């Protein structure tokens, strides 16, 4: 999906993605890249093809529709739909295209079993809740679930999954350990009947910081795209080798003086304390560049950090280029990345008051190009 009729350019560096994947695979050779939500805004198929060429043999996406795009795009290996089959059409698609759906309800078991052809086996991923309280069977559900599976031999659990709630916070490692212990018990229970079932618990933070929770398959997400899930913690150094893979730029429309005492933008929230030079950049909240950055965000122009002045508008934002010589209309202003004093996804998220995941998913909705 792309935001139309704007001037933003999103440039995805596939080489950085590949290097991040290679870094993570050195820690966990069985890493299954998570490329849900259009690969966190980086482009589903280009990212999948790059990582497949780098050695990835399985992927996890969000919806069955995304998984179908991967299959139709020529991705041959295991593809896991993390949201599972949410309706009959999803179930039919999973069975027909060999997509592995997460299963977290008895209704989903029935939908999938009812669509298997005679003699066909349908691979599924059993999703358990070990502390996230989101999707999944409980540990107490396990005996009844195993009985249901035995009664439906066309369904084959190839993966057992759960999700960690605070693996990115070393101060709450006790809860992460409790989740790991619960998952270990669940996995052992499933393997008593299906010994080939693989366990998958570790997300990006656990891949970096909790090798004891790697089990068989790891699911790196945000770390693939160069954001450090352990930033701001005592374990931040574990993600030091990750490289942001997205640059976002917009053209400067005009450069003009702002005399001392003159205000700028809606609401007159900023008044120049001295004679200044401002650049008007062709981006705003209609381009998924948050209005919350008004008066506190920054961009990079000619490799220098420049602060936002006043309110972010629908399609325009003003920045202070007083101390940056030679700025002219047509020059690029970098909202994210770029040369020099580049803003990382984590830094922009701090200014935005959110997390790097949201920054990448939203800005990635703008027109994209891919390069090495």
UniProtKB/Swiss-Prot annotation:
Record: active site: 36 (proton acceptor), 266 (proton acceptor)
Name listed for the protein in its UniProt record: Alanine racemase
E.C. number: 5.1.1.1
InterPro entries in alphabetical order: Ala_racemase, Ala_racemase/Decarboxylase_C, Ala_racemase_C, Ala_racemase_N, Ala_racemase_pyridoxalP-BS, PLP-binding_barrel
Record pathway: Amino-acid biosynthesis; D-alanine biosynthesis; D-alanine from L-alanine: step 1/1
Protein's job: Catalyzes the interconversion of L-alanine and D-alanine. May also act on other amino acids.
GO molecular function terms attached to this record: alanine racemase activity; pyridoxal phosphate binding
Enzyme class: isomerase
GO cellular component: cytosol
Annotated family: Belongs to the alanine racemase family.
Species annotation: Nitratidesulfovibrio vulgaris (strain DSM 19637 / Miyazaki F) (Desulfovibrio vulgaris)
N6-(pyridoxal phosphate)lysine, modified sites: 36
Residues that coordinate or bind substrate: 134, 314
Catalytic activity, reaction form: L-alanine = D-alanine
Keyword Protein transport: no
UniProt entry keywords in alphabetical sequence: Isomerase, Pyridoxal phosphate
Residues forming coiled coils: none
GO BP annotation list: D-alanine biosynthetic process
Needed cofactors: pyridoxal 5'-phosphate
